[in-house]
């Protein structure tokens, strides 16, 4: 009888430990998603001017409006922009310098590419693409506009939820 009781207590103890560990991991992931995210450049203000072209919350801090336009763009976990194209009659395009977190970049018809701090993405004018944060990570990059003639952006459809959720 004592052995049965001891085994029952051991089983209950193991179950409680597993439940506690699972809860602790969940809490750790939640804290990571909501923790303060800092990079070299200030996050900036909520990107309300372009909010209709994003799923989730992004922030924009314009670092330079002279010579070459440079903005620090920060994405909350799960935030991404719609497919879009940077058009130009000559030159144009964009360069991304990843400064923090984990995100993705994808060109139309190609596989998504994971982005980590230090990665550089050269986006020629006329290429349909999107970028954004991983579901469980903040993401930040510098967006450098390549000078060109008659530059303009064309905003397209959001990234399909099924496609985004399939990313690791």
Per-range role (PLM):
Residues 125-153:
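Ligand-binding loop in jelly-roll beta-barrel domains
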């Amino acid at each position: 009888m004592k052995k049965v009781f001891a085994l029952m207590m051991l089983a209950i103890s193991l179950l409680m430990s597993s439940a506690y560990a699972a809860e602790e991991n969940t809490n750790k992931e939640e804290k990571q998603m909501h923790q303060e995210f800092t990079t070299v450049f200030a996050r900036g203000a909520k990107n309300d001017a372009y909010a209709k072209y994003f799923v989730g919350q992004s922030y924009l801090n314009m670092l330079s409006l002279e010579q070459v336009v440079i903005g620090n763009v920060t994405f909350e976990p799960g935030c991404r922009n719609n497919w879009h194209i940077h058009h130009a009659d000559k030159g144009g395009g964009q360069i991304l310098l990843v400064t923090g977190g984990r995100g993705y970049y994808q060109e139309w018809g190609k596989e998504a590419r994971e982005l980590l701090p230090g990665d550089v993405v050269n986006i020629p004018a006329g290429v349909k693409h999107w970028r954004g944060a991983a579901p469980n990570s903040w993401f930040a990059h510098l967006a450098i506009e390549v000078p060109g003639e008659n530059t303009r952006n064309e905003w397209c459809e959001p990234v399909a939820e099924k496609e985004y959720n399939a990313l690791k």
